[in-house]
A protein has these predicted regions:
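Divalent metal-coordination and catalytic microenvironments
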Residues: 8, 23, 28, 50, ...
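C-terminal cap of metal-dependent C-N hydrolases
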Residues: 351-354, 434-441, 447-449, 459-461, ...
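Active-site neighborhoods of metal-dependent hydrolases
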Residues: 133-137, 142-162, 167-176, 180-202, ...
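Glycine-rich, proline-tolerant flexible connector loops at the mouths of alpha/beta enzymes
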Residues: 94-95, 197-207
């Protein structure tokens, strides 16, 4: 298919000023760019007068590695202009095989257990290498491109080190370390683009730091990028630790989902500013360090998942798991005992306090801003606990506990009730989003699975709106359009080592987006999280139109991009 885009205001992804131009696309590539192209015939011509042509957006932190198999249409990415996902973040990668991926992911992410096991249990999809995973994805014909990483959790688990509790923490045995290094090398040989880790999740939190650094030296050997989910999600201590480890290993560093929620109390330093200062110092000292930022920062907690998953219960209430209870029903029955219920309340308080110290969120004061959705009582729908407390004369904290235990007739909920903590709305954190996102070393990211999470689980607002919101936050606060587009295109492509996409240039792959620069922005919010972005007209992937004048075309021309190799052929 050939395509001619005429009369466009071209923003090329480099940060350079826009220019007027026509762009001719053929055989997946940008063949020609000129002020006017009138001497070629194309299968399709798009008049982009009044619109802006940009490279396709690159999401440097996606969690689409599992959901893409079942939802290859990837609507949430396409409708906000994303044409390439980097996947396998936070150490959970589909490499080296499906069984290891499932084992490590579901052991930690309790809320993912049911979805992944239900979908994969009876599916025909299986793989035993990165190459085979790529073939599985291509057999599903993805709408956009994906770029896989190697993950620490998957590597150490496959190597035989399977820590599940603090008592399992130890140095890896020489044979385990040798196997882990071989797995990393093999992943890179098969085309993985980098290495991801985390320090907050099982089993990664029990790995000895020196062992992580030893594995990072292999990443440096192959000149790949390290993508850490740092300790306590980018607290100053976590950022400092990541920088120190990167220096010791000599590896290029990209810090994942930089935390914009400060942990501060009156008279103390905003920890977001402190963490940014640590990054600046490292950069001044010559270190290659970058980071990404979620443009929405809210958390969604289905209470039925919180209370109905005993593994998650044991994690949330580590000091007082459900004593003697073998089922959720037994636990709920036991919770009717006031003494036991108060024990659980006190444990929750301790958990919230620890989380506030570590991460800077889950303050008790946030409870009055918690929003309820999918309730069985329409009088509760969309209201906050603060509003309900005011209406009914209760306390937001007690109402939250009543909701979890489902004992209050006021807050009697359906099994699918959702609790949202809107952590960048209504609190003085919005400025931190701007501060971090406008930083010269930052790029926006989504940090969620693609379209297809369970209906009963509310979408994180980033799922459909991270990039349009990031654009609006920047442009509406005086950042030049060209710089905002660069952060979503050419810059993340450079960070990950992608050389044939991210820019509107002759010879580059034709991943392109056409937007209305005034209207482009999020259509969603914390409650209506799945509303599509405004002001996006066309999305083109590998030269084919996947969104045509605002409508999805059902084209799925995406590819699995493997470093140093040609694209994986379609099945």
């Amino acid at each position: 298919m050939s395509l001619l885009i005429k009369n466009a205001k071209v923003v090329d992804g480099s940060g350079s000023p826009w220019y007027w131009g026509d762009v001719f696309v053929q055989d997946k590539e940008i063949k020609r760019i000129d002020r006017k192209i009138d001497d070629v015939k194309a299968d399709r011509t798009i008049d982009a007068e009044g619109l802006v042509l940009t490279p396709g957006f690159v999401d440097i932190h996606a969690h689409t590695e599992g959901t893409i198999v079942f939802h290859p249409e990837m609507e949430c990415d396409v409708t906000q202009g994303v044409t390439t996902d980097i996947l396998g973040l936070c150490s959970y990668s589909p490499y080296p095989d499906k069984a290891t991926y499932m084992e490590t992911l579901t052991r930690n992410m309790a809320r993912n257990v049911l979805w992944y096991r239900t979908h994969f249990a009876n599916s025909p999809y299986d793989w035993h290498s990165l190459t085979e995973y790529a073939q599985v994805v291509m057999s599903r014909r993805p709408a956009i491109n994906v770029m896989p990483l190697v993950g620490l959790a998957s590597v150490i688990w496959k190597a035989g080190y399977k820590p599940q509790a603090e008592t399992d923490a130890r140095k890896m045995k020489p044979a385990e370390m040798a196997k882990a290094k071989d797995l990393i090398r093999q992943g890179f040989a098969e085309g993985a683009w980098g290495f991801s880790t985390t320090r907050d999740y099982n089993p990664n939190q029990y790995v000895d730091p020196d062992d992580v650094i030893e594995m990072l030296k292999v990443v440096a050997e192959y000149k790949r990028t390290w993508f850490p989910h740092t300790t306590h999600v980018c607290t100053p201590e976590g950022v400092r630790e990541g920088i120190e480890w990167a220096k010791k290993a000599g590896v290029k560093l990209h810090i994942a989902h930089f935390n914009v929620i400060p942990n501060f109390s009156p008279g103390t330093v905003n920890t977001v500013y402190e963490a940014l200062g640590i990054v600046d110092t490292a950069r001044d000292q010559g270190m290659d360090v970058t980071f990404d930022v979620m443009t929405w920062f809210n958390y969604c907690y289905p209470p039925h998942t919180l209370m109905h998953n005993l593994r998650h219960l044991a994690r949330v209430y580590p000091d007082k798991p459900p004593r003697g209870t073998q089922s959720v029903e037994e636990f709920r029955k036991a919770a009717q005992n006031p003494d036991y219920r108060n024990e659980i309340k006190n444990t929750i308080e301790q958990y919230i306090h620890r989380a506030a110290i570590r991460y800077g969120y889950f303050y008790r004061e946030h409870l009055d801003s918690v929003i309820l959705l999918n309730t069985s009582d329409e009088r509760l729908e969309g209201k906050t606990l603060g509003q309900l407390a005011k209406e009914r004369g209760g306390d937001p904290k007690d109402m939250y506990y009543d909701l979890c235990f489902e004992t209050s007739p006021i807050l009697k909920t359906s099994p699918n009730t959702i609790v949202i903590w809107p952590l960048t709305t209504g609190y003085p954190y919005e400025g931190n989003v701007l501060k971090a996102l406008s930083h010269p070393l930052s790029v926006p990211s989504i940090d969620t699975p693609t379209y297809g999470v369970p209906v009963e689980e509310h979408f994180n607002s980033n799922t459909y709106g991270a990039f349009p919101r990031g654009y609006r936050v920047l442009v509406d606060h005086g950042v030049e359009m060209e710089e905002a587009i660069k952060k979503m295109t050419g810059y993340p492509a450079r960070i990950v080592g992608l050389t044939d996409r991210g820019f509107v240039r002759e010879g580059m792959k034709a991943d392109l987006v056409i937007i209305d620069p005034v209207e482009f922005g999020p259509g969603n919010n914390l409650i209506n999280a799945t509303e599509r972005a405004h002001g996006i007209s066309y999305v083109i992937v590998n030269g084919k139109i996947v969104m045509d004048n605002g409508k999805l075309t059902q084209e799925r021309p995406g590819e699995v991009l493997l470093r140093g190799q040609k694209s994986v052929p379609k099945a």
